[in-house]
Amino acid sequence: MSEKIDKAMQLFKESRYKESIDAFHAVLETEPDNADVYNNLAVAYSCVADFSHAETYFTKSLELDPQLAQAYINLSDLYYKSGDLASAVGTLQRGSYELPDNLAIAHLLARVYIDDQRWEDAIVELERVLDGEPENYDAFYDLGHVCFELGDYDGAISNFETVTEYRQDSELLYYSLAQAYEANNEIDKAISNYLKSIAVNDKFTLAYKKVAILFMARNDFDDAIEYFEEYTNFEIPQEEKESVNKLIERIKLKQG
């Protein structure tokens, strides 16, 4: 039987999904209670965009083995990608109940809560993740995002700064940190982190406009002009480019 499973898995790895579906069904003829095979079969169906069969076989997998963490993750992902956040949440909540020590499920549940703007619920799950994994920097980043959305800018800054101790290669991290400093009216630190975002990725368009605006607000007109001009060199809508060019001209007039 192991040979049949290996064959089905090999077909799947080769992206021969329809053939792998047939092969998994052949296994189930003699192993009708194999939860892992049902899970793999469901994944294969999801790869050919057969939502109905994928849902059916993920559900069957969990009926046979309520402790199969990957099936909860896969089924919730199926619902999430279809836009059914309520079912994604329900699946992960059940998985979290069955597997209270599985922090991967807890973290995924937090992220679905974030997408559904259930901020307080997300905080509960993220804090649970961080209690068990105090160096989970993705969870710190997500918690920073939630704090920002709730207007807790000090909390957002604290969480994002924690992540920067571990990662210095993410323009989005520095951009998020800069936004939090800006919202907290700490303009110098906001500028510093927008510039760090650009240093990591000099094609990150949004940071150029943001830092230019802050330079302008600080009356650093030469720097504002420099970054606005850099911004207009990117592929941005013509209307936006014309608007920024007019702003540059007004700044130059103000300089005299």
Model region roles, listed by residue range:
Residues A26-C47:
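Short, charge-rich amphipathic alpha-helical segments embedded
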Residues R111, D138-Y141, H145-D154, S158-S192:
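Alpha-helical adaptor scaffolds
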Residues N40-V43, C47, N74, L108, ...:
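Canonical tetratricopeptide repeat
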Residues E14-D22, V48-K60, S82-R94, D116-R128, ...:
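Structural signature of tandem alpha-helical TPR/SEL1-like repeats
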Residues M1, A35-D36, A69-Q70, N102-A104, ...:
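Helix-start (N-cap) detector for alpha-helical repeat units in TPR-like alpha-solenoids
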Residues T30, L64, E98-L99, G132, ...:
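Structural marker of alpha-solenoid helical repeat scaffolds
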Residues M1-K7, F221, I225-G256:
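Terminal, low-structured helical/coil segments at or just beyond the last alpha-helical repeat
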